[in-house]
């Protein structure tokens, strides 16, 4: 039997060689294998299994630990050691004197009270010692120190029973009734003196069970979204409704930010300023009396920076000021790559609309109904500024009734079972003249009040709008829903007046305007002028200090935010004293008129320059000689018609001049006069061009700039082609 070619193993040394395990052969790159690692588990999963299973230490029969368990400190780590001798062990550590503590405490208190100071970093100081706890010192009752537990209860009690103010249910009822009467008397007195909080005027307390629909914005999910936004944002913008700023302010959230998140900056944005008169938002200082109404921007600026805003993608107000303020914050936080700005507030206050206005496009879904935003959303404004949209939140308050919740725009009106029950409270807040004008109702002496007045006005509105039930009965619930929707969307004029500077015995604005100025009033005005001068001096000194500090530190300084609030265009028309509740001085009025006239003239000049730029250049305007040559020959009649059309259009424009053109005819240059003279020489006929409705009407917005067509003498397409051919031939 012959042998095969592979039969001789000595001849083929590589035949039958067994593959060795990885890492056993010398000179081969090996990895350190973990105990337990095999085909089924890698090193990570093996370590995890070892952690889960190896929770016990290995001990001998005497109970001593032979092998410590995982995550268990052994005896070797706790061996006694020798401390290295050093003089620093006996020296002073970080110490501070009481005088320095008092100085830091007063400085910190002043900076905390200033809403425009920004906390960037906390130094290595004992902040617990620096914070002033005088307000909270008496908050905790020291019961144990006053009466120890052993002296009150137990075998060594010194009295038989605890001292209780109320011993029965009858005494509890009497005490609660007395407390209620005392609270009512206190609120009535505060309202009479004018010291009551405006947010408490329409907020009676209630103890009845509420329907689930009135608990919108208070769910655990929405408040979880709020805390996500607060934790993620460096700047928190609280959006308020200009019609009721204090009513739409989330006081618990503001207090939480002040106490727990002092390093986050709070800014108020007063949205929907186009729905209130300009004097409510703010106004020139010359119009404000010492006892006149304080504007909302000035009032809210005492607690935080406040900006008036009107959210609109095309016609907005306050957009530049808000972006400038956000850029200031980004400059302050120059050590960060970017800052996040969170928008919080009540539902339907315009948070998403403000973000769309800043982006100048629709990036957030918006609707005139509350609850459109469900979850938080990140939007990139620019490279270093991010915006965070938050769903609307409603802080739980015992002062808010169901009607207050509805009138603040928290609840969707179509989901209300009985919307007519909220109309009496609405009638108390709105003047009857506005309802008559909005719904075209007949004038009623004294207006509508109470449930009876609500029934009367709802019946009239239902009949006017055709909302009837079977048998021709007016549908009051449908009419109430319509009124509430108009209220929420701003069609019914309403606003809460800003707080006035109330002083005991001070005269009102009307009496002050009518009466002659006394010596006391003169002293008051002089004192106010001195205060204003001192404030200006201090502001100048602070600005100089900021400039010098910026030069030293090399920090880029950004200008302050200013707003021309007097230029806000109000959408709703208010009556008489609502439109302007301050008395204007004659000199101030004259100055304002001059300023307005100058601004109007500048705007007119800019508009005229834009119109001249927008006018299309014709061929004859650039090459008049060639145009005359082209117009000769076969196209004489057509050119004559075009010339007459041009002249007739000019005549029509001169016959019906606009207000801008009347004031500008004196400023026509001599070159323009020569051009018009040259054009008038070319007129050869008096034929009138036929006109119709579409000549002057603005159909499909094509003729929006002028009453006459923009270029009535423009050649047709065939004419352009012929002139083009002739021009080619000439060339």
Curated annotation (Swiss-Prot):
Residues 699-715 have a biased composition (Basic residues). GO terms for molecular function: GTP binding. Keywords: GTP-binding, Nucleotide-binding, Nucleus, Ribosome biogenesis. Residues 685-698 have a biased composition (Polar residues). Residues 132-145, 519-541 have a biased composition (Basic and acidic residues). Coiled coil: none annotated. Residues 597-655 have a biased composition (Acidic residues). GTP binds at residues 345-352, 389-393. It is found in: Nucleus, Nucleolus. Belongs to the TRAFAC class YlqF/YawG GTPase family. NOG2 subfamily. GTPase that associates with pre-60S ribosomal subunits in the nucleolus and is required for their nuclear export and maturation. This is Nucleolar GTP-binding protein 2. The gene is NOG2.
């Amino acid at each position: 039997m012959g042998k095969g070619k592979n039969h001789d193993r000595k001849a083929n040394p590589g035949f039958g060689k067994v593959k060795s395990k990885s890492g056993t052969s010398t000179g081969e790159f090996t990895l350190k294998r973990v105990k337990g690692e095999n085909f089924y588990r890698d090193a990570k999963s093996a370590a995890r299994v070892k952690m889960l299973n190896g929770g016990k230490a290995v001990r001998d029969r005497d109970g001593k630990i032979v092998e410590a368990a995982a995550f268990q400190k052994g005896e070797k780590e706790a061996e006694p050691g020798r401390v290295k001798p050093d003089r620093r062990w006996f020296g002073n550590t970080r110490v501070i004197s009481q005088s320095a503590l008092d100085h830091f405490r007063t400085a910190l208190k002043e900076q905390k009270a200033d809403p425009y100071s920004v906390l960037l970093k906390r130094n290595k100081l004992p902040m617990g010692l620096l914070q002033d706890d005088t307000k909270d010192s008496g908050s905790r009752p020291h019961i144990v120190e006053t009466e120890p537990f052993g002296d009150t209860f137990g075998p060594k009690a010194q009295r038989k029973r605890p001292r209780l103010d109320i011993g029965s249910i009858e005494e509890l009822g009497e005490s609660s009734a007395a407390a209620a009467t005392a609270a009512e008397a206190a609120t009535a007195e505060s309202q009479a003196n004018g010291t009551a909080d405006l947010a408490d005027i329409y907020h009676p307390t209630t103890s009845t069970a509420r329907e689930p629909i009135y608990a919108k914005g208070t769910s655990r999910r929405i408040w979880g979204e709020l805390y996500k936004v607060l934790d993620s944002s460096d700047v928190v913008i609280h959006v308020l409704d200009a019609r009721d700023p204090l009513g739409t302010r989330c006081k618990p959230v503001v207090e939480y930010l002040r106490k727990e998140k002092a390093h986050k900056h709070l800014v108020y944005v007063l949205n929907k300023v186009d729905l209130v008169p300009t004097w409510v938002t703010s106004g020139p200082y010359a119009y404000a009396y010492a006892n006149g109404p304080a504007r909302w921007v000035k009032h809210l600026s005492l607690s935080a920076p406040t900006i008036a805003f009107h959210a609109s993608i095309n016609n907005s107000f306050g957009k530049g000021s808000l972006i400038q303020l956000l850029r200031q914050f980004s400059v302050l936080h120059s050590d960060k790559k970017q800052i996040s700005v969170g928008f919080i507030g009540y539902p339907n206050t315009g948070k998403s609309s403000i973000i769309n206005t800043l982006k100048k496009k629709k990036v957030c879904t918006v609707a005139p109904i509350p609850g459109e935003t469900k979850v938080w959303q990140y939007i990139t404004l620019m490279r270093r500024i991010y915006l965070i949209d938050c769903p609307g939140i409603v802080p739980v308050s015992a002062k808010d009734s169901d009607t207050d919740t509805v009138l603040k725009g928290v609840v969707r009106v179509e989901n209300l079972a009985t919307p007519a029950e909220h109309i009496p409270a609405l009638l108390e807040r709105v003047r009857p003249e506005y309802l008559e004008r909005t719904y075209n109702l007949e004038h009623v002496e004294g207006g509508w009040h109470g449930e009876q007045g609500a029934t009367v006005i709802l019946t009239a509105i239902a009949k006017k709008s055709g909302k009837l039930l079977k048998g021709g009965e007016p549908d009051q619930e449908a009419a109430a829903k319509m009124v509430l929707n108009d209220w929420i969307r701003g069609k019914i004029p309403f606003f809460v007046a800003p707080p006035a500077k109330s002083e005991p015995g001070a005269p009102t604005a009307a009496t002050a305007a009518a009466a002659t100025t006394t010596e006391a009033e003169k002293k008051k005005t002089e004192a106010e002028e001195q205060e204003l001068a001192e404030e200006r001096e201090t502001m100048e000194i602070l600005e100089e200090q900021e400039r010098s500090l910026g030069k030293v530190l090399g920090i880029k300084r950004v200008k302050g935010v200013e707003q021309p609030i007097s230029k806000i265009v109000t959408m709703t028309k208010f009556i008489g004293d609502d439109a302007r509740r301050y008395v204007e001085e004659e000199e101030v009025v004259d100055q304002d008129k001059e300023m307005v006239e100058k601004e109007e003239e500048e705007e007119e000049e800019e508009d005229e320059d834009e119109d001249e730029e927008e006018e299309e250049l014709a061929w004859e305007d650039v090459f008049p000689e060639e145009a005359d040559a082209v117009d000769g020959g076969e196209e004489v009649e057509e050119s004559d018609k075009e010339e007459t059309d041009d002249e007739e259009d000019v005549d029509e424009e001169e016959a019906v001049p606009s207000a801008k053109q009347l004031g500008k005819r004196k400023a026509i240059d001599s070159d323009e006069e020569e051009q018009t003279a040259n054009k008038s020489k070319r007129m050869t006929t008096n034929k009138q061009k036929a006109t119709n409705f579409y000549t002057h009407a603005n159909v499909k917005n094509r003729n929006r700039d002028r009453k006459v067509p923009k270029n009535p003498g423009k050649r047709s397409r065939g004419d352009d082609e012929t002139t083009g051919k002739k021009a080619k031939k000439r060339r």
